[in-house]
Design a protein with these regions (language model features):
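PP2C/PPM-type serine/threonine phosphatase catalytic domain
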Residues: 1-239
Length: 239
């Protein structure tokens, strides 16, 4: 199968960008992180996480869920060591990572950066945010649409840069026509699942898919909006 991808990041209405991302379509490795601005130097934490995960994933001989969870733990240790430096004591970050090898997808995440999976143009799954708001949804206290507007949505329960480090991993089969979206909360809070799916069905390339979604995002974001980043991935049959 042939993999293609498109990456986009924007500081939004903020004075600097605390999101980081890296992608290598030829190796099937994609990583995105969102540093927490209220916890010291979030941009340092997200860059450390992305660099650590991306380097380890591209060098790994084989990746399964347990291996990827171990790589998240090692990335966490890297950030914890960096916290010993002045001004960086409280830095934290979310992270989401995807590996595509053959007909298998392996992913892991921590925090509220998301991975969406699509098969045949239909939503096949989305990671569960590690947030107070998403816990309310899982507990039946609020609806799924309330997740986008709830006051507690930025209160994260799991992050890198803090112990214990408790990422979650998943695995699934991949077929030609499948697609993936990795994104930070600054993006997904303004573009809903059915819209992501509708734009995917219109797009011929990962870039077109991203551009269609970004048009929706731009129309909805208020002044001073958060950084927003995404990686779109297409899996196609070899020509």
């Amino acid at each position: 199968m042939q993999i293609s991808a498109y990456t986009y990041t924007n500081r939004g209405g903020r004075d600097h960008n605390e999101d980081s991302l890296r992608a290598a379509a030829d190796q099937g490795v994609f990583v995105l992180a969102d540093g927490l601005g209220g916890h010291g130097r979030g941009e340092v934490a997200s860059a450390l996480a992305v660099d650590a995960l991306f380097t380890a994933m591209t060098q790994a001989e084989a990746l399964d869920g347990e291996t990827l969870l171990d790589l998240f733990q090692k990335a966490n240790e890297t950030i914890l060591r960096q916290q010993g430096k002045p001004g960086q004591e409280e830095m934290r970050t979310t992270a989401v990572a995807l590996n595509l090898t053959g007909d298998t997808a392996v992913w892991a995440h921590i925090g509220d950066s998301r991975l969406y999976r699509f098969s045949g143009g239909e939503l096949a799954g989305v990671t569960a945010d590690h947030s107070v708001t998403y816990r309310k949804f899982l507990g039946g206290e609020i609806s799924y649409m309330d997740v986008y507007h709830d006051d507690d949505r930025s209160r994260l329960l799991r992050v890198l840069g803090k112990e214990p480090c408790r990422p979650e991993a998943g695995q699934g089969s991949v077929s030609p026509g499948d697609a993936f979206l990795l994104c930070s909360d600054g993006f997904w809070e303004y573009v809903y699942n059915e819209e992501i799916q509708a734009d995917l069905c219109k797009a011929r390339t990962p870039k077109e898919w991203a551009e269609l979604m970004l048009l929706r995002h731009i129309r909805r974001t208020p002044p001073g909006n958060d950084n927003f980043s995404l990686i779109t991935v297409f899996v196609e049959a070899l020509e």
